Amino acid sequence: MRTNYQQESFVEGCFNRIFKGLSFKGIGLELARVKEIVEVERIENYKLPLLLFLLEDDTLLHIEIMNDEIKPDFQSMSVYDMSIVLKYGMQVRTVILNFGSKQNSNFQRSFGSVYYNTQIVDLSGLDGERVYEELSQKIGSGCLLDGRDKLKLVFLPFMKNSLPFNEVLPKVMSLIEKIKDEEERMAYVAVISEIISRSTGDQGVKVLKECLMDTEVGIRIRDEGKKEGMRDSLLIILLHKFDSLPDYINHAIMNQQNESILMDWLIKA
């Protein structure tokens, strides 16, 4: 398990900028504040946790999201949670943020003598269009976003909306472009991009790629990623979400060759 006592990657830095010190009390979770984002080692054949935070009380918070299109992988969730408990002896609390139809308050499953319980936080009452208007007014007036506003902005693409996802996401990205602080803008785009790439299928990644290519902050994210090396860039993280990569692209990534090879392939993909 990795925390920031090692050199944090570009994406980890963006997550920490948005979430560090954040409280989840605004959505009904009585937990300690976020200390930092945590990355765990990948377990073959199982989907990585969407979000894993180290809290100030030295417990871990594992967050997944669901709506009417996105369903959590409960098997992968339980495998990673139990692996962390057994390997590191840390307490893990797992929460699913539900933006779809109203769901039960928890998910329970037993594995022999092990009892696995996941809390579902029902956020189905959040209207994405209303939330968009509220955030648009705050951002437009230059107001600082509080903790609850930050959570709303990060998860805005997944809320109920009369528009399809491929129309909602560009609106969210355009809203973020209005944030005055450049580093803040970049952090939000990076965080939302990573969440989308981890939680949606190829269609979501395709929409995301189009949004990133067309925005100033998306280009900045790509350039910042290049400074760290190709394997740490957001662009590479997104590319790993494709079903497969040509052998010469895999070779270019592993050997950190000229990024133009990768960019040419991405443009044609």
Language-model features, listed with the residues they occupy:
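Alpha-helical solenoid repeat scaffolds
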Residues: 153-157
